[in-house]
């Protein structure tokens, strides 16, 4: 840890099309090898498909999908007297968003559809309907935290 001053987190510029910081972060997570314009094209195409399917606004549909994937609790390893416990801890809001976006992108990459835009659109629509791989990942994390509730007093 630095002994001098703590450097604040950088402000992220909102995305050019919708003016959303959350969407800009999502584009950055999807981006590979610094190809931001490609990532933006994929995200915008996926959002267009998602909006047509759901009949909602682009950002509204995206927010709904993200809400259904956001975890509230997770487990962290804590070593106590030679044994390691999985201690359930609450997830901070910024990390909730980051995890949800990461899980959606991972799940979309594992899908077997043709283009990445289609895979992302399908995963987002599944997430909006509370199904799909990303939602399953959140359920697994919650189940793990529930199973280890007995170790909650080891929180730090």
Swiss-Prot record:
**Gene Ontology MF terms in the entry:** rRNA binding; structural constituent of ribosome; tRNA binding
Q: Name one GO biological process term.
A: translation
**What PROSITE patterns does the entry give?**
RIBOSOMAL_S7 (PS00052)
Task: Name the keywords, alphabetized.
Answer: Ribonucleoprotein, Ribosomal protein, RNA-binding, rRNA-binding, tRNA-binding
**Gene Ontology cellular component?**
small ribosomal subunit
InterPro entries xrefs: Ribosomal_uS7, Ribosomal_uS7_bac/org-type, Ribosomal_uS7_CS, Ribosomal_uS7_dom, Ribosomal_uS7_dom_sf
Superkingdom is Bacteria
Q: Which residues form a coiled coil?
A: none
Pfam (any one): Ribosomal_S7
Q: Please give the subunit comment from the record.
A: Part of the 30S ribosomal subunit. Contacts proteins S9 and S11.
Give the record's family classification. Answer: Belongs to the universal ribosomal protein uS7 family.
Q: Which PANTHER family match?
A: RIBOSOMAL PROTEIN S7
* Record function comment: One of the primary rRNA binding proteins, it binds directly to 16S rRNA where it nucleates assembly of the head domain of the 30S subunit. Is located at the subunit interface close to the decoding center, probably blocks exit of the E-site tRNA.
Name of the protein this chain belongs to: Small ribosomal subunit protein uS7
What's the source species for this entry?
Photorhabdus laumondii subsp. laumondii (strain DSM 15139 / CIP 105565 / TT01)
Question: What is the gene called?
Answer: rpsG
